[in-house]
């Protein structure tokens, strides 16, 4: 009964929808020492619920056949099922889930005693981590259960996943807001207490603190409220202070009790703050160079005469010698040539400040003219609609 207080939804509604979309639905319910059975065809019961035997076990078996009258395709994608069942096993430590694909005689068993700790470990597999996984569970006074696991790694991306009663919220919500507030407060307090901010002469932001962070936030909330029927954002106001209070207490204690981990995390944050500041300065410098100012690209870009981007082409060639040949053979009216030195930076794996400090990348950004960064990138300003 306690499980149903924080269930993800009304199970009867779910099975009713499945029934309406199935050519056949078969139910076996083991309850109170008896085995009950009922079957539906295209939503209509074939007989009343009946007792077909006795049992010592409890549980429900639901079998359904998707209706070909409703769906154009009724083939199950086992990867989608595996991803969700694995997720549920992580979220419910100790629950064993078995997925069998009898079409190809394949079986997956999901059983994670470590719960969210193993979830973080799974996500961070193959990455270099900076601290051991921090994991706690707490029950608050207003009946909200809070569970958090997190770990920093050497990547530059934030990966935080939020769940309410096992349902994922891709748009976050009040649980994410409480988590972020407590995380930032705890780290800022540590940096101030250790006098790190004054020593390093930097100002850090919440984004700096979350660079390279992998975290799972799972809350159990009686009667949760969401922004829409799809439950993609939690809006229950009582959840934010519950998560913030629990996280603040546990995380502050973790930083005090694990000085080496705290030092590694602080180093990561300082690096992120410096990189952000360097990127800001580089953006300002790039912004000052007009994309139409050919003086900004001395001896590099051989622009075309055409001013309409839809009719203009840009050819990226390797090296000045190839650039010279390309310039001689081009159609000056519509074809521009931009020579670049050899193998330029792999921007997918580079930090933003390193990417923007690369001369070749900077040349390319200026020539294309559409800007960089979330605030300034505008594809409508692209100077060439064909880039080769």
UniProtKB/Swiss-Prot annotation:
More info: Few gyrases are as efficient as E.coli at forming negative supercoils. Not all organisms have 2 type II topoisomerases; in organisms with a single type II topoisomerase this enzyme also has to decatenate newly replicated chromosomes.
Alphabetical GO biological process terms: DNA topological change
Site (Interaction with DNA): 343, 346
Function description: A type II topoisomerase that negatively supercoils closed circular double-stranded (ds) DNA in an ATP-dependent manner to modulate DNA topology and maintain chromosomes in an underwound state. Negative supercoiling favors strand separation, and DNA replication, transcription, recombination and repair, all of which involve strand separation. Also able to catalyze the interconversion of other topological isomers of dsDNA rings, including catenanes and knotted rings. Type II topoisomerases break and join 2 DNA strands simultaneously in an ATP-dependent manner.
Subcellular location: Cytoplasm
SMART domains: TOP2c
Gene name of this polypeptide: gyrB
InterPro entries given in the database record: HATPase_C_sf, Ribosomal_Su5_D2-typ_SF, Ribsml_uS5_D2-typ_fold_subgr, Topo_IIA, Topo_IIA-like_dom_sf, Topo_IIA_B, Topo_IIA_B_C, Topo_IIA_bsu_dom2
Xref: SUPFAM superfamilies: ATPase domain of HSP90 chaperone/DNA topoisomerase II/histidine kinase (SSF55874), Ribosomal protein S5 domain 2-like (SSF54211), Type II DNA topoisomerase (SSF56719)
Similarity annotation: Belongs to the type II topoisomerase GyrB family.
Name this polypeptide is given: DNA gyrase subunit B
């Amino acid at each position: 009964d306690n499980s149903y207080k924080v269930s993800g939804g009304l199970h009867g509604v779910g099975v009713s929808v499945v029934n309406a979309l199935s050519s056949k639905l078969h139910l076996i319910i083991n309850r109170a020492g008896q085995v009950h059975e009922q079957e539906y065809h295209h939503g209509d019961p074939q007989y009343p619920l009946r007792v077909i035997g006795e049992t010592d076990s409890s549980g429900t078996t639901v079998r359904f056949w998707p209706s070909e009258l409703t769906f154009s395709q009724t083939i199950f994608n086992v990867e989608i099922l595996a991803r969700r069942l694995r997720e549920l096993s992580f979220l419910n430590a100790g629950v064993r889930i078995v997925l069998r694909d009898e079409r190809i005689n394949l079986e997956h068993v999901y059983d994670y005693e470590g719960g969210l700790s193993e979830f973080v470990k799974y996500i961070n597999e193959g990455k270099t981590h900076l601290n051991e996984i921090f994991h706690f569970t707490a029950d608050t006074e207003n009946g909200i259960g809070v569970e958090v696991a997190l770990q920093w790694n050497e990547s530059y991306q934030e990966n935080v996943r939020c769940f309410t009663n096992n349902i994922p919220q891709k748009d976050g919500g009040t649980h994410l807001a409480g988590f972020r507030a407590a995380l930032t407060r705890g780290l800022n307090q540590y940096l101030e207490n250790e006098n790190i901010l004054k020593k390093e002469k930097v100002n850090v932001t919440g984004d700096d603190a979350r660079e390279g962070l992998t975290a799972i936030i799972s809350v159990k909330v009686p009667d949760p409220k969401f922004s829409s029927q799809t439950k993609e954002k939690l809006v229950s106001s009582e959840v934010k202070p519950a998560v913030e209070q629990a996280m603040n207490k546990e995380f502050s204690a973790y930083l005090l009790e694990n000085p080496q981990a705290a030092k590694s995390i602080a180093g990561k944050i300082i690096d992120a703050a410096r990189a952000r500041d360097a990127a800001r300065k580089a953006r300002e410098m790039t912004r000052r160079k007009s994309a139409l100012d050919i003086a900004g690209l001395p001896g590099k870009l051989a622009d075309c005469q055409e001013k309409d981007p839809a009719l203009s082409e840009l050819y990226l060639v390797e090296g000045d010698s190839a650039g010279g040949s390309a310039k001689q053979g081009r159609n000056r009216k519509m074809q521009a040539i931009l020579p670049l030195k050899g193998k330029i930076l792999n921007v997918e794996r580079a930090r933003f400040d390193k990417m923007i400090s690369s001369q070749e990348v900077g040349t390319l950004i200026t020539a294309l003219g559409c800007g960089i960064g979330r605030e300034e990138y505008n594809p409508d300003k692209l100077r060439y609609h064909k880039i080769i």
